Swiss-Prot record:
Keyword flag Nucleus: yes
InterPro entries documented for this protein: Akirin
Coiled-coil blocks: none
One Gene Ontology term, aspect cellular component: nucleus
Bias (Low complexity) ranges: 49-60
Position of the signal peptide: none
CDD domains to which the protein is assigned, alphabetical: akirin-1
Gene Ontology annotations of biological process type: myoblast migration involved in skeletal muscle regeneration; negative regulation of skeletal muscle satellite cell proliferation; positive regulation of lamellipodium assembly; positive regulation of macrophage chemotaxis; positive regulation of myoblast differentiation; positive regulation of transcription by RNA polymerase II
Compartments where located: Nucleus
Protein name from the UniProt record: Akirin-1A
Chain positions covered by the region annotation Disordered: 14-65
Gene Ontology molecular function, alphabetical: transcription coregulator activity
Primary localisation category: nucleus
Length: 186
C-alpha cells in the first residue's frame, strides 16, 4: 500500500518541488555567522537533467579556491576572531567591575602578571601569507585523501562486479552443459 501511495502524488505536490516554484529554499546561517546568509553559502546548483553526468575531473574543478579567495576567507575569519575577542574582553571587563572587591582580596595571594607576557600573547605565530600556504596545503592533502578513498571504493566495486560476472557465467555454463565434461569441440 505504501508503494501505491507514493505513486499517486497530486500535481500540487510536484508544483511545489519543481525548479520553477515560487517558494525559495532557505539557508540556515552557521553559528557565529551574521544573521543574513551570504549568497556564497546559499548558492544552489541547478539540477542536472537526467542522462547528463560530469566526469571525475570536472567534479572538483568548479569548487577549487584560488589563493586570493583563500586569503580573503582567512582575512574574514581573522576579523571575526578579532571581534569575538573584543566582545569577550568587554564582557570580562564588566565582570571585573562587578567582582572588584573579590579581586582586591585575592591580589595579595597571586603574583602580578608581567606586562611582557601580554605583548607576547598578542603576537601572531604565523603571518597571513604563511596561513594561506598552510590552508592551501591542507586543502590539497584533504583532496588527495578523498581521491584515494574514492579510487579504493571504485576498485572494490569493480572487483565485486567482476566476481558476480564470473559466477553468472559459470552458472550459465553449468545450466547449458550440465554435468557433462567440457570438451574442446562443444
Amino acid at each position: 500500500m505504501a508503494c501505491g501511495a507514493t505513486l499517486k502524488r497530486s500535481m500540487e505536490f510536484e508544483a511545489l518541488m519543481s525548479p520553477q516554484s515560487p517558494k525559495r529554499r532557505r539557508c540556515a546561517p552557521l553559528p557565529g555567522s551574521p544573521a543574513t546568509p551570504s549568497p556564497q553559502r546559499c548558492a544552489i546548483r541547478p539540477e542536472m537533467q537526467q542522462g547528463q553526468q560530469q566526469p571525475l575531473s570536472q567534479l572538483g574543478g568548479d569548487r577549487r579556491l584560488t589563493p586570493e579567495q583563500i586569503l580573503q576567507n582567512i582575512k574574514q575569519e581573522y576579523t571575526r576572531y578579532q571581534r569575538r575577542r573584543q566582545l569577550e574582553g568587554a564582557f570580562n571587563q564588566c565582570e571585573a567591575g562587578a567582582l572588584n572587591e573579590v579581586q582586591a582580596s585575592c591580589s595579595s595571594l597571586t603574583a602580578p602578571s608581567s606586562p611582557g607576557s601580554l605583548v607576547k600573547k598578542d603576537q601572531p605565530t604565523f603571518s597571513l601569507r604563511q596561513v594561506g600556504i598552510l590552508c592551501e596545503r591542507l586543502l590539497k592533502d584533504h583532496e588527495d585523501k578523498i581521491r584515494e578513498e574514492y579510487e579504493q571504493i571504485l576498485n572494490i566495486k569493480l572487483a565485486e562486479q567482476y566476481e558476480s560476472f564470473v559466477k553468472f557465467t559459470h552458472d550459465q555454463i553449468m545450466r547449458r552443459y550440465g554435468a557433462r565434461p567440457a570438451s574442446y569441440v562443444s
